[in-house]
Amino acid sequence: MRSVYDFIIKPVGKRYDIESFKHVNNIAEVVETPVAFATSIKKGDLIIVHHNVFRVFYDMKGIKKNSRSFLKDDLFFCAVDQIYLYKRKDTWKSFGDRCFVAPVKNKDILSAEKVADLIGILKIGNSSLKGSGINPGDVIGFTPGSEWEFVVDNQLLYCMKSNDIVIKYEFDRNEEEYNSRWAQSN
């Protein structure tokens, strides 16, 4: 069974039916790839998907419902734009125009915030960024509200689009990655 435009996936581990999006599982295994186009993602690859794919919610009458992605049993449809990363041979690779940035520790001694605003270290790039001379390990700046938190291999990372990265800091800033304890406990 293959879908024309969507991947068919199954969650790795439990789906979770907790209402907060931060606690919904977003790791899946690819069962089938779309028929309509070729993709770098193959059957059996692990992928990180949007939190609404496996989401369970309650309608206006209080009845428990599956997300629109639900197919049957433990299988779900997943659109191309709902996939952010895929893993093959122990290496995570970005998919499409997504990239992942590690937050950095806040050096401002007058601030109570632990993470610096709008700055990070590129961890997982893509071909668009590489073509612009922005590579993993570079200190970058990004636009406000563009980052979504993900925990990837027990590390807190921000997912964003390539166009959200607006500057590469060329001089040595001595930035240090921030990773909270809660990210390591997942």
State where each predicted segment sits.
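Acidic-enriched and Gly/Ser
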Residues: 1-186
